[in-house]
Each structure stands twice: as structure tokens, then as C-alpha cells.
């Protein structure tokens, strides 16, 4: 059963400009592993987290640091902990599907939470 679906788009040049203006934004929104990646990968991970929040019904009370987008070979997946793991458990989420892409200056993420 599908519990939630989320989609988000992030313009990579806007992400880069925002990071230039607010350097602390990266530390707040991305884990250390994500923060050292190229801008296009950072933007994709930001979009992934936004899509996850949408799929879980909103981001209130959730920490950006409580999820990390992990690459396993060609596939990407979330590692959830803390507030995000609790929210997923409360909703009955058993599996989170994640798809990421970046092309033509845009990063796109789609998340499906399955129970």
C-alpha cells in the first residue's frame, strides 16, 4: 500500500547561489558526507529530502540531519534515523523508494513511501 508520494525539483544554479549567500545552509540541510559532494549532487539530495518530507506528510518536527541519501553502486536510498525514522514508523512505512536525476541544470527527486 502506498502511504505517501513526494516530488521535488531544485535548480542547481539557485542552490549554488543560496549556498554562496548562506554557507551554513549546507551544514544544516546536508550530512557531512553529502556536503562534500559537487553542487549538482547536493541539490539532488536536498530535493530528495524535500520529496521525502512531502511523502511523510510534512517536515514539521523533522531534522534534516536525520536522513542521508546513500549511493549503493548505481542505486540511491535513504538512511533514516531519529525523527524521520520515528515518523516513518508511526505512519507504517516499511519501504522508501527514491529516484534521483540531474540534467540541464535541474535536480529532480521522487519518493514513494510504501507500507
Swiss-Prot record:
GO terms for biological process: fatty acid biosynthetic process. One of its GO terms (molecular function) is holo-[acyl-carrier-protein] synthase activity. It catalyses: apo-[ACP] + CoA = holo-[ACP] + adenosine 3',5'-bisphosphate + H(+). Its cofactor is Mg(2+). SUPFAM superfamilies: 4'-phosphopantetheinyl transferase. Keywords: Cytoplasm, Fatty acid biosynthesis, Fatty acid metabolism, Lipid biosynthesis, Lipid metabolism, Magnesium, Metal-binding, Transferase. The keyword Thylakoid does not apply. Gene3D superfamilies: 4'-phosphopantetheinyl transferase domain. Its EC number is 2.7.8.7. It is found in: Cytoplasm. Mg(2+) binds at residues 8, 50. One of its GO terms (cellular component) is cytoplasm. Transfers the 4'-phosphopantetheine moiety from coenzyme A to a Ser of acyl-carrier-protein. Belongs to the P-Pant transferase superfamily. AcpS family. HAMAP family: AcpS. This is Holo-[acyl-carrier-protein] synthase. It comes from Cutibacterium acnes (strain DSM 16379 / KPA171202).
Amino acid at each position: 500500500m502506498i502511504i505517501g508520494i513526494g516530488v521535488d525539483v531544485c535548480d542547481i544554479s539557485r542552490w549554488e547561489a543560496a549556498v554562496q549567500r548562506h554557507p551554513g545552509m549546507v551544514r544544516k540541510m546536508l550530512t557531512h558526507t553529502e556536503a562534500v559532494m559537487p553542487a549538482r549532487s547536493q541539490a539532488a539530495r536536498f530535493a530528495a529530502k524535500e520529496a521525502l518530507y512531502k511523502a511523510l506528510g510534512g517536515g514539521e518536527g523533522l531534522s534534516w540531519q536525520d536522513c542521508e541519501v546513500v549511493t549503493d553502486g548505481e542505486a540511491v536510498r535513504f538512511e533514516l534515523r531519529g525523527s524521520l525514522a520515528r515518523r516513518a514508523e508511526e505512519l507504517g512505512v516499511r519501504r522508501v523508494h527514491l529516484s534521483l536525476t540531474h540534467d540541464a541544470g535541474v535536480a529532480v527527486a521522487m519518493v514513494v513511501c510504501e507500507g
